[in-house]
Each structure stands twice: as C-alpha cells, then as structure tokens.
C-alpha cells in the first residue's frame, strides 16, 4: 500500500505536518512487537516524543480459494482487525512498560508461511509444520528471556493466537502457561494477523494486570519465518 496507512492516520488525527511517520510492512502476523520495539527506539532518541503504534490488517483483501488445505484453512482462519497504543518515555501513575525485546529469524523456513502471486492475486502458503515451527521458535525465545539477569519472573504469557493447532503446540511446549486470553481472541475474532497479540493483551488485562511481582511476556511470530517477544510489566 502506497502511501502507507500512517499517512491516512495522521490526516484523520490532524497531526502536525512535520510529524514523523513510519510504516513497517512485510512482517506478517509478528509485526506488532517489532513496531513496539521501533517505538522504544524513537523514544530513546527523542525522550519528549509521544508515539502512537498502530497494527492494522485487512486480510480479506487477500481472499483466495482453491483446494489446497493450507488455502482453505487460511480462508477460514484469517480476519480483519486493528489495534493501537500510545507510548511515552516516562509512564504516568499505574503505567506499564515494554522492555527486554528479542527476535529470532529462521530464513530456512521462509517458504512455510508466505504470500505468493497466483492469477494476479495474493495466495497464502501455510505449511502444516507451522504450529511446531512456532512452538520451537517461541521456546527458544522464552529460554533466552528466562536467562536474563535482574528482571522480574514471567507470570503470564500472551501469545499471538495464530490458530487452534498453534496454541495447542505452544501450550504443549510451555505447559505452565495456559493461553486462555489468546484462545478467547481466536474464538471471537479469528487470526487478525499482527493486531491479534494486542487483542490478547487487552483480553488478559480484563482478568488483571502485571505488577511488581512479575512481568507478562508477549510473543508473536509470522512471515520470515520469525518470532518476536518482549516483557510487559508495571513501570
């Protein structure tokens, strides 16, 4: 999409004409957490800035049908959605912070999850190995997060609700962390791609919020194949 979504968002919000706009594309379902990481970098360079992060996907624009099982699953699974958050370098009372960002790239598995062009349309490639691939990548990132020194323990995992089999594989890999919020989002909204993990975060916060006794751990994954994670906790 050119110009990007940020151009239209800035116009509708009436932002000043010299506001810095940046569109991150090509990251698929995993994009929300890298966007938060980009916001962290902007705030580090400009401590007085206010950053709006928007994750928006119109999966219905890539609707395609044939008899391939991956295509059929994609047509049943994916949906449209958007989520947004506002960030500052200094949180207010009762605020939260994202930190401890990490990423894992697995380019050897790039072709297991991607778009291709077919008859002038976007056709989703969804390999049956994706659930186990996601679980393996998430396990590696979580191991690295657990090894970090001087951080709070992880009390809850908020995962991208990529599908039933994906969530089953994640819970099998990390059985101490049930993914109830992610399952509710999948049930109610389907897989909205990048906004989904933020929907799961909002859903989890209906049950409670992280505090000084422990962080939540957000994780998403998608095209590349790549996985991304960060800690979310009380400031």
Task: List the model feature ranges, each with a label.
Residues 11, 18, 23-44, 135, ...:
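Claisen-condensing/thiolase-fold acyl-transfer catalytic domains that form or cleave C-C bonds
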Residues 63-136, 140-143, 221, 233-235:
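Condensing-enzyme catalytic core mediating Claisen C-C bond formation in acyl metabolism
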